[in-house]
Amino acid sequence: MNSVNNIRSTFLDYFHRNGHEVLSSSPLVPRNDPTLMFTNAGMVDFKNVFTGLEKHSYNRATTAQKCVRAGGKHNDLDNVGYTARHHTFFEMLGNFSFSNYFKEEAIFYAWNLLTKEFCLSKDKLLVTVYHDDDVAAGLWRKISGLSEEKIIRIATNDNFWMMGDTGPCGPCSEIFYDHGDKIWGGPPGSADEDGDRFIEIWNLVFMQYEQLSKEKRIELPQPSIDTGMGLERIAAVLQGVHDNYDIDLFRTLIHASQEIIGVKATGDFFASHRVIADHLRSSAFLIADGIMPSNEGRGYVLRRIMRRAMRHAHLLGSKDLLMWRLVPVLISEMGQAYPELVRAESLISEILKLEETRFRKTLERGLGLLNEASTHLEEGDYFNGEVAFKLYDTYGFPLDLTQDALRRRGISVDVDAFDKAMKRQKAEARANWSGSGDCVTETVWFSIRDQVGATEFLGYETEKAEGIITALIRDGEVVDHIDLGQKAMIVVNQTPFYGESGGQVGDSGIISGANFIFEVHDTQKKGDNVFIHIGEIKTGQAKKHDCVELIVDSARRRKIRANHSATHLLHESLRQTLGSHVVQKGSFVSPDRLRFDFSHPKSISSEELKKIEDLANDIVLQNSKVTTRLMAIDDAIAEGAMALFGEKYGDEVRVISMGNNLEQTGSKKWWSIELCGGTHVQRTGDIGLIHIISETSVAAGVRRIEALTATAARLYLHGQDRRVYEIAGLLKTSPADVQERVQTLLDERRKLEKELNDSRKKIALNGGSVNSQGDIQTINGISFMGGVVSNILPKDLKALVDSGKKKIGSGVVAFISVSEDGKGSAVVGVTDDLTDTLNAVDLVRIISVTLGGQGGGGRRDMAQAGGSEGGKADEALVALKDSLKG
């Protein structure tokens, strides 16, 4: 059968047989293009290769690239589920030539694959070429034998590809499949081209020009090829279906959601099942590549995708959490092709489960607030965009959910007002942000790399070396010399200074020549391995080509080494304690401390933290040798080395192994084995001691620990001991008894607070100390007891109101408590005999409006609310009593 997995492997095997390097998919977060939200095409990772900024050992490549289009310029989110071919996640099959073969081979490879390997009928295929690309048209006639009618010339930009306003560009040739005259639509270039009969399945881009400016375009001396074929589209063709969602992969996912929910994918429910299947793929792959749901950037797009799927699960009537239960089905279909899914399975499941649990609460709360804010609106009205933004910003209720909920009532959202509120918030955020100040563009570093070559790093073996200055940069410009007092950057042909990367900060130290001393404050790695020494000339003048001596601050480096090695031990300790779903999400290694971010869906208990710390320190006490090896990537992974999700590695990697396997079970020899380019201790004992000082949340599903090592850890613990002794002195007890003494004092305080609170309740019920409003009054024939009380906790107000209801027998009771920070909390009770005519929820909302609150909630007999303006408590009670007067 032409399954999705078979089609993918057939494509890659075909081009491998034809001399192409088969490369793994790049991460969904582009490595070298900050202008892109997500990788959305096969050529994204090769942009610098096409422009000449990067070079590889191969000049032919083929990939199955995972892509996401759900944010920024390329955004298919709103169409997904309602059309046959829109997806948030898709796979792009491609073959690439970097100044190797050109049009003839590209056309031959494509035609041969489609007609010989995939066995498509020639009669079902037609192609387009750019209107003046006579070469491509002639090659199609020669290779395929297609008639002139089936080689269509297109004059629009659809058949001319550009990377940007400038850069490589060239004409395209698109291959179309004819689904037959039973489906409406005409061939490309015709009046009916928007129909679904003729579907593009492959695009060949002939990069033969370079756009220098809007008016000037020149021929490239060595043209290249970039092609892209959507796997889902070609699968639909080869499986004889017209709709991408009818291919085997989607049929399996949709069948699973139908079975779990118990609702068939028909009628009004058809689109919802398709949305869930598509969004499951994008959510799982984004999480596996290190994206976590959040309220900004890529994390916000992921959250929108997840919540859109979860909303459709809600529309289908799913009573239980759904998305995480579909993960095993997805992995059974795609895990072999994408092993990162298998490695991240538990994390994907936990994040989906956590997010869907939160979303259900958000959905319930958001719909309640939305209904309250829109009760006065009628069909055809506009909902206030500022309020819609507040629902999003404060309560996490996305705009698309607000629009969907109101659309059923014929109400639109003022999107312009929403956008203005969003822009205002972003402007305020930008005003509070300051950049790095580095005005040198990446192009400068690549230019230096091309002129003088990469910097040779010597820092693994030594902290002192000699070299020659190859470049000097001052104020963003390449210069020939730098003078006394000037801040600048120095590039040397070789260096022992480590350039900041992999979370490890750059080295500092001294670069000196015959006529100058340069103090290095930081070292960065730019472009393609160009090491930049950043600092200031302290004496003399430095010139290009000067011979220099480079000396790293060894004391600082020693602390950094200890902290970096400690992160590896803590990483493995976390996995041993919490589970294999723990993977690194970020780190910061400085001489003062270390910070380690990792995937985990909940906070870590003190007992777990102690175990994590103890495990790591057990390896420190082993004082075992830390081993560094250069290995083939496949061998390293086979040995158990941990690779980071979202990272792309070369064929040869540096592997750091440390510690003996404590369990002495299985094939794993080492305690920790990771791919890493940082600097490390020689023996684990050099770390001295590891002490975790904090554990916090960074984002949904991401936790952070901070720790100290060696002398810093010892001094920290000494400080803790000193504080315990000082506290013991204040409490007049021994350090060993401090905890017991503090617990006794806390128990006594709680007892006194309870007695005080009980006394305040009694006073309130008896009419005292409540601003003279605690007596029972009669308003419009209704008994009323109410007042303003001080320092009664909001949670105790309900008990106070219940007591008041018993005291008056029939009527309304309302108490407002004002806290020390000026906030007001209110509870209103209505006795059972009056709930047919009076509603406590309506009454408490009158109080809430006066207190500056958002409304309230509860039952007809008991409701609560609050507000920030507790000073208006008396005014709020007056408003309530006025409402009872009628």
UniProtKB/Swiss-Prot annotation:
EC assignment: 6.1.1.7
Pfam families recorded: DHHA1, tRNA-synt_2c, tRNA_SAD
Keyword Plastid: no
Transmembrane regions listed in the UniProt entry: none
Enzyme class: ligase
Localisation per UniProt entry: Cytoplasm
Single Gene Ontology MF annotation: ATP binding
Domain of life according to the entry: Bacteria
UniProt keyword list: Aminoacyl-tRNA synthetase, ATP-binding, Cytoplasm, Ligase, Metal-binding, Nucleotide-binding, Protein biosynthesis, RNA-binding, tRNA-binding, Zinc
UniProt cofactor note: Binds 1 zinc ion per subunit.
CC cofactor: Zn(2+)
UniProt cross-references to InterPro entries, sorted A to Z: aa-tRNA-synth_II/BPL/LPL, Ala-tRNA-lgiase_IIc, Ala-tRNA-ligase_IIc_anticod-bd, Ala-tRNA-synth_IIc_core, Ala-tRNA-synth_IIc_N, Ala-tRNA_ligase, Ala_tRNA_ligase_euk/bac, DHHA1_dom
PANTHER family, sorted: ALANINE--TRNA LIGASE, CYTOPLASMIC, ALANYL-TRNA SYNTHETASE
Protein name: Alanine--tRNA ligase
